[in-house]
A protein has these predicted regions:
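ATP-dependent phospho-/nucleotidyl transfer catalytic cores
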Residues: 1-19, 32-33, 136
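Catalytic glutamate of the conserved HExxH
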Residues: 15, 22, 43
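Generic structural signal marking isolated hydrophobic packing positions
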Residues: 21-22, 159
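Hydrophobic residue at the +6 position relative to the catalytic HRD Asp in the kinase catalytic loop
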Residues: 22-29
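C-terminal catalytic region of ATP-dependent kinase domains
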Residues: 35-171
Length: 171
């Protein structure tokens, strides 16, 4: 796989919003006129946490989606080593859940790799691009996605903090 700075930025973005549903059918790279276009078609499994135990979405054995309190308290960065960063991303349930849901486990076990070994410079670059968004634009995106008014400001604040964290990696 050719990992361009744009693809690495997309990987950092998916980690930043805790999008654990990184199945191939949800994320594509298209080439048109010798130019790559990156498409994410499903962000429903984002803005929660990607770790055990799930809080209030019992249908998911390992994560939550769209839960402000979980997103606020979730970790972003696992480690920065040398010139690369690994983001916190747990896409599989604990062993005692996996043994009963083998297909589910197999579907998501490789997705954790998306958040590993991203060049710091590429993560900082996507952070700088995202920093161009105004606070109003970020809040408008959450409103357009159907979040409740009480959640919009909280989610936006977490996003803004995570953008700043991307920009200031290794500082």
């Amino acid at each position: 796989m050719c990992r361009t700075r744009e693809l690495n930025g997309l990987r950092a973005l998916m980690a930043r919003i805790n999008n654990w549903n990184l199945a191939t059918q949800n994320n594509k790279v298209y080439v048109a006129d010798n130019e790559r276009h990156y498409l994410v078609s499903d962000l429903g499994a984002a803005f929660g946490k990607t770790e055990w135990p799930p809080s209030d979405v019992p249908r998911l054995p390992h994560a939550t989606e769209g839960v402000l309190k979980d997103y606020e308290h979730s970790s972003l960065i696992r480690a920065v080593k040398g010139d690369s960063v690994t983001f916190e991303m747990h896409t599989t349930a604990p062993f005692f859940v996996r043994i009963f849901r083998g297909k589910y486990f197999n579907k998501y076990k490789q997705a954790q790799r998306v958040a590993q070994g991203i060049p710091v410079v590429d993560a900082q670059r996507i952070g700088a691009l995202l920093a161009r968004l105004t606070p109003q634009q970020i809040r408008d995106a959450f409103r357009a996605a159907g979040y409740q008014p009480a959640e919009v400001d909280g989610l936006a604040k977490v996003v803004e903090k995570r953008i700043a964290a991307l920009i200031h990696l290794k500082e």
